[in-house]
Design a protein with these regions (language model features):
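Short beta-strand-to-loop capping motifs
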Residues: 38, 170, 261-265
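Glycine-rich, charge-dense phosphate/pyrophosphate-binding loop(s)
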Residues: 206-298
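ATP-binding N-lobe of GHMP and related small-molecule kinases
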Residues: 1-92, 106, 110, 114-116, ...
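Glycine-rich beta-alpha junction loops
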Residues: 30, 142, 169-174, 221-222, ...
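Gly/Ser-rich oxyanion-binding loop with an adjacent helix/lid
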Residues: 76-152
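Short beta-strand segments
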Residues: 9-11, 27, 138-141, 147, ...
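Anionic-ligand binding region
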Residues: 144, 148-154, 173-204, 214
Length: 298
């Protein structure tokens, strides 16, 4: 059992990239770092004001994940003080809940000496999230493509792609449950085939570093964009502006409400500045894909 303090660093993520709905994730260069030290009772201290509304006791998602992960293996963990530093916008489509879950799994693994395999961690995180896209990328880094059911899990990983990323963050957060409530219960067989083809071609294009084709396919999503785009002010205008400045493609980041824009490498700062000026009610953040996933430092 771990007694001395340690830290866990986990990247932000974006999910779907359009038609890769619920199975494609990409780690991003924004990060959450959690320092864990023994304490008499569980206490979470957030250093970022945006997280001030979150619970700081055992009801916190990170603590719940730690306890549930340990309990799966009939282990209990001693209380900790968790000091959290994060530059990941909360509830804005950048996998903040998946980051918390990934961190909790890693902390439980360390505190209870569970010696979990990568697949163990991926299965636990995906079960807790209900889908595999964000949490696999948070745990492994790079880009992940997952097949996940109650009985089976398969994950392929790709290195972080050589692109720049711009995230357009709106001023209002959107709960994932609300966003999922906008989706239809069914698609026709013909629609499903079209969506699957777009996702397959996009993934193949990314694997071949063909981001021109990948960007086009990002914008061919039929699974969620048509139903969720109504919640984004100036959605079509932003997409047109992205094309004007040479972006590969633009789509909704995860369940929203942020937008993910793939751009040629080393242009993300310039594109972010242009979009920030043109759409001031959004915050344009320049970043890159992240190679590394969750990491423990002693």
């Amino acid at each position: 059992m771990a007694e001395a303090g340690f830290s866990v660093t986990v990247p932000a993520t974006t999910a779907n990239l359009g038609p890769g709905f619920d199975h494609l994730g990409l780690a991003l260069s924004l990060k959450m770092k959690i320092e864990a030290t023994p304490a008499l009772a569980w206490f979470i201290q957030y250093h970022d004001k945006e997280y001030a509304s979150l619970p700081t006791d055992e009801t916190n998602l990170i603590v719940q994940t730690i306890q549930q992960t340990a309990a799966r293996y009939d282990q209990a963990v001693a209380p900790q003080k968790l000091v959290v530093y994060s530059d990941i916008p909360l509830g804005k489509g950048l996998g903040s809940s998946a980051t918390a879950i990934a961190a909790g799994i890693e902390i439980a693994n360390e505190l209870a000496d569970l010696q979990l395999s990568k697949l163990d961690k991926l299965c636990i995180g995906s079960e807790m999230e209900g889908h595999a896209d964000n949490v696999t990328a948070a745990l492994l880094g790079g880009m992940t493509v997952s097949y996940f059911t109650e009985e089976e899990m398969e994950v392929l990983t790709f290195p972080a792609p050589p692109i720049g990323v711009v995230i357009m963050v709106p001023p209002v957060a959107l709960k994932t449950e609300t966003s999922r409530g906008l989706l239809p219960e069914y698609l026709t067989h013909k629609e499903a085939i079209r969506g699957s083809a777009a996702g397959s071609l996009m993934t193949a294009a990314i694997a071949n570093s063909d981001w021109v084709t990948a960007g086009r396919m990002m914008e061919r999503d039929i699974y969620h964009e048509p139903y969720r785009k109504i919640g984004f002010p100036n959605f079509d205008e932003i997409r047109s502006a992205c094309r004007e400045v040479g972006a590969y493609g633009m789509t909704i980041s995860g369940a929203g409400p942020s937008l993910f824009i793939a751009v040629p490498p080393e242009t993300e700062q310039q594109v972010a500045a242009l979009l920030d000026q043109r759409f001031p009610h959004y915050q344009a953040i320049a970043m890159q894909p992240a190679e590394n996933g969750a990491c423990v430092t002693k």
